A protein has these predicted regions:
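A compositional/biophysical signature of low hydrophobicity enriched in polar/charged and small residues
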Residues: 1-95
Length: 95
């Protein structure tokens, strides 16, 4: 991200208010329309989804949380984890 002048990468763990088929489908539909979210995974554990977000700076990310993710009715809570350094990044599976 730094090389592309994109600031930094954030992994945002999202917990929905309630989880059922309709709410999950609506959430994923909304997320697919948000360009700042470059990856989205349905996960197990304390949270329901893991989002990968690119942000140019902290103020931008704060506004994104308040004005974009914060407007999603089904969103219950979130936790942001900021990437300090990318240690390894590969595509594909080596057999």
């Amino acid at each position: 991200a730094e090389k592309l002048n994109q600031g930094f990468v954030v992994f945002c763990s999202v917990k929905l208010r309630r989880l059922n088929k309709e709410i999950a489908a609506e959430f994923t539909r909304i997320i697919q329309e948000i360009p700042q979210v470059t990856e989205c995974y349905n996960i197990s554990g304390s949270y329901d989804y893991l989002l990968k977000i690119h942000a140019p700076n902290m103020r931008y990310y704060q506004e994104f949380i308040l004005n974009v993710l914060g407007t999603i009715d089904s969103l219950g809570s979130l936790e942001s984890t900021f990437v300090m350094d990318e240690v390894k990044h590969e595509y594909g599976i080596h057999i």
